[in-house]
Structures are given as structure tokens and as C-alpha cells.
Design a protein with these regions (language model features):
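Beta-sheet-rich non-transmembrane sensory/scaffold domains
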Residues: 1-193
Length: 193
């Protein structure tokens, strides 16, 4: 309270490694992009330089690399008196691009994420548990911009031509892509009007 400069101030400190943040009317979300390293299982012949000496080594290429990009989410509640209280933590697969990759709607956190599998929207409940997500869109493309507006999300990915995806979020447990529009060039910023 700036009108009472001699009043004691109570502070809470939290030490986190963050790459982005989002503040809604009632919550503060802090995000940390990370990478979980999985198991790498190279073919035996490449380990020892042997070609066929121990016979063919069969492996499932889907299991070869199990590393993945993740986004860790820390949620803090903004209390009535203006103080902040830690609420919960969670994580989702994929990474975000900027502050427009997040949105809180009806108490649910919505995130636009991408990785090598594609782009997607993931919806988390107030305890940061996943309640819905889209299928991976634009496999092999990078997400360049995203924007949430009410029950819709808009994503722009890029490879050669910029597809603009429209995603219906009216049912948070079953978000779905409504369609895409291919436009030349690429957009790194979407602005509602």
C-alpha cells in the first residue's frame, strides 16, 4: 500500500528457471522449456564396428530415440488480499513459442505447443492435469504464431506455405481442428480485431 510507506511488507520468494510467463485475473503461470532425455539404443554393430559378425540386430526405430521436449508449468494463485500462493505444478509434451501460446478460459489453461511430431493445443484443468488435446497438426513444420480468442484458437505453421489452422475449443475435452487456410509467406504474429 503506497499510502502507508512505513507499514511492513511481507514477501514470498520462489526460485524457478522460467522461459515464459502468463498472468490471468486469478492466477500466475510460469513456464520452463526442458528436454527429457530418453534411452538411446544404437544397433550393436555400430557399437563395436562389427558388420554382421553377430548377425542382424533388429530394433524398433520408434524406440530408438525416446527423448522429447517438454514444458513444465508452475501455477500460483493470486489471493483476495493480493498475496500469491503456490498452487500446483505439471508438465506437457512440446514447447511454446511466446506469450501468446497460453490462455486461461473458464479456469482451464490452454497451451499451443509444438515439437517434431507437429503442433497441438493442450487443455489442462485447474490442477494442471490434461483434459483434452488436438491431434498433431502440421507434422514436420514449425509453429510460428498462435492466438486464442474465446472458443477458438488460431495457429500458423511454416514449411513452404503458411497454413493457418482454426481449432474449435468449445468442448475442452475434445478440441478439434476445423480447417486450414494455406497462404504464401509466413506470419509470426496474429492480432485479433
Amino acid at each position: 500500500d503506497l499510502t502507508k510507506p512505513t507499514e511492513n511488507i511481507h514477501l514470498n520468494s520462489y526460485f524457478l528457471d522460467i522461459s515464459n510467463s502468463y498472468v490471468s485475473e486469478h492466477n500466475i503461470y510460469l513456464f520452463d522449456q526442458d528436454y527429457e532425455y530418453g534411452n538411446y539404443a544404437p544397433p550393436i554393430s555400430s557399437l563395436f564396428g562389427l558388420k554382421g559378425a553377430i548377425g542382424p540386430f533388429v530394433y524398433n526405430s520408434d524406440d530408438l530415440y525416446t527423448s522429447r521436449s517438454i514444458t513444465k508449468v508452475s501455477k500460483f494463485k493470486i489471493l483476495e488480499d493480493g498475496s500469491i500462493s503456490f498452487a500446483t505444478q505439471g508438465k506437457v509434451e512440446g514447447k511454446t513459442i511466446n506469450q501468446y501460446s497460453f490462455d486461461e478460459h473458464n479456469g482451464q489453461l490452454r497451451l499451443a505447443l509444438y515439437d517434431f511430431q507437429g503442433s497441438r493445443i493442450v487443455i489442462l484443468d485447474e490442477n494442471l492435469k490434461e483434459i483434452g488435446k488436438t491431434l498433431d497438426l502440421a507434422k514436420g513444420e514449425t509453429m510460428y504464431s498462435s492466438r486464442f480468442m474465446g472458443d477458438k484458437a488460431y495457429l500458423v505453421t511454416y514449411q513452404t506455405v503458411d497454413p493457418l489452422y482454426v481449432v474449435d475449443l468449445s468442448d475442452p475435452t475434445h478440441p478439434r481442428a476445423l480447417g486450414e487456410l494455406k497462404i504464401p509467406g509466413y506470419s509470426t504474429y496474429l492480432h485479433p480485431y
